[in-house]
Swiss-Prot record:
Pathway: Amino-acid biosynthesis; S-adenosyl-L-methionine biosynthesis; S-adenosyl-L-methionine from L-methionine: step 1/1. It comes from Daucus carota (Wild carrot). K(+) binds at E43. L-methionine binds at E56, Q99, D246, K277. This is S-adenosylmethionine synthase 1.
């Protein structure tokens, strides 16, 4: 049997880039909670004891940017200079301007357009991916790397491993078999964890705790054997971390946010963007389409692409590839997708409830993945949703409720992934049952 190795990585919520993603999505949540029509393009950067929030925001919301920065940093665990940043005493810089009027009139007509007529906020192409190798319909290498990172945070915050600090990275290499286009995991080849720690713990203690409290609960025993390689803090020392160790910037972990290198990526980041930005809403709707294809039994693995022009509601193209695993021809799957989903941005916002903020909804996506990191029960996967989705940018915002901020809705997306999360705020993870007739044997 011919096999191959494939690797995916993840980073913790205390990684400086993920810190910035979470702040940007916390700002988005705050704007949408008070004003669902907020137009948000929020960037964040950070270095030693300094955070800068900048970008273009047009909103009726009253947003205390400094308060959001301090709270987000504190919640992650950056509470002193020793761990990489002092949330309560760090310097906060704010440089926010309004959205360009040229963009505003072209996309939403200064809020005068109907949802179905709202144009895409920019040009671009987005990809959705799904595979039947895990219950989440996500790649196993990505799922394991992401869950290891989330577990590191859990055992740090609950006191199981008090020597842990917020920053950290994980990486998992899986040995796969290609079953006529479908990916079949055979075993875990290598596990790599590099985690920030205090100055008192020994390398032996780190390795023992990571194996017992992080790896063992996350990686199923069936994937581990005597040949599995473990690299646990291989550099030997990781005391200095967070923004003190490296500068952070929003939007630099786009592969971690999606599929761990599987499928494809159009290049656009998610965090800090309202649903008129198709980098985010377009990627969410094609994930739902791809996931629905696999969950409905149309294919074992597939990728869906959509593309847009700025100011134009209708997508320029929609593409489906089942990697040879489709039960019917790809052209027929594509036709089902076009008949079932509405790719207009305004309708995506409605159908996926993407204008609803608050309660950390988008903040949840900003760490540990936007897709596929929690098993969704069959009753949720198969529940009946609207018969047709609209992919025009303005309608995406309405259909996915992407204008709703507040309560950390978008902040949730900024760490640990935007896809595959078992959370009612992740509306793009609900599978649509697709109607099709199985060919006669």
């Amino acid at each position: 049997m011919d096999t191959f190795l494939y690797t995916s990585e993840s980073v913790n919520e205390g990684h400086p880039d993920k810190l910035c993603d979470q702040i940007s999505d916390a700002v988005l949540d705050a704007c949408l909670e008070q004003d669902p029509d907020s137009k948000v393009a929020c960037e964040t950067c950070s270095k030693t004891n300094m955070v800068m929030v900048f970008g273009e925001i047009t909103t009726k919301a009253n947003v205390d940017y400094e308060k959001i920065v301090h709270k987000t940093c504190r919640d992650i665990g950056f509470v002193s200079d020793d761990v990489g940043l002092d949330a309560d005493n760090c310097k906060v810089l704010v440089q926010i301007e309004q959205q360009s009027p040229d963009i505003a009139q072209g996309v939403h007509g200064h809020l005068t357009k109907r949802p179905e007529d709202i144009g895409a906020g920019d040009q671009g192409h987005m990809f959705g991916y799904a595979t039947d190798e895990t219950p989440e319909l996500m790649p196993l290498s990505h799922v394991l790397a992401t869950k290891l990172g989330a577990k590191l945070t859990e055992v740090r915050k609950n006191g199981t491993c008090p020597w842990l600090r917020p920053d950290g990275k994980t990486q998992v290499t899986v040995e796969y078999y290609n079953d006529k286009g479908a990916m079949v995991p055979i075993r875990v080849h290598t596990v790599l964890i590099s985690t920030q720690h205090d100055e008192t713990v020994t390398n032996d203690e780190i390795a023992a705790d990571l194996k017992e409290h992080v790896i063992k609960p996350i990686i199923p025993a069936k994937y581990l054997d005597e040949k599995t390689i473990f690299h646990l803090n291989p550099s030997g020392r990781f005391v200095i971390g967070g923004p003190h160790g490296d500068a952070g910037l929003t939007g630099r972990k786009i592969i971690i946010d999606t599929y761990g290198g599987w499928g494809a990526h159009g290049g656009g980041a998610f965090s800090g963007k309202d649903p008129t930005k198709v980098d985010r809403s377009g990627a969410y709707i094609v994930r739902q389409a791809a996931k629905s294809i696999v969950a409905s039994g149309l294919a074992r693995r597939c990728i869906v692409q959509v593309s847009y022009a700025i100011g134009v509601p209708e997508p320029l193209s929609v593409f489906v590839d089942s990697y040879g695993t489709g039960k019917i021809p790809d052209r027929e799957i594509l036709q089902i997708v076009k008949e079932t989903f509405d790719f207009r941005p305004g309708m995506i916002s409605i159908n996926l409830d993407l204008k609803r903020g608050g309660n950390g909804r988008f903040l949840k996506t900003a760490a540990y993945g936007h897709f596929g990191t929690g098993k969704i029960p069959d009753r949720e996967i198969l529940k009946i949703v609207k018969e047709t989705f609209d992919f025009r940018p303005g309608m995406i915002s309405i259909n996915l409720d992407l204008k709703r901020g507040g309560n950390g809705r978008f902040l949730k997306t900024a760490a640990y992934g935007h896809f595959g999360r078992d959370d009612p705020d992740f509306t793009w993870e609900v599978v649509k049952p697709l109607k099709w007739e199985k060919p006669q044997a």
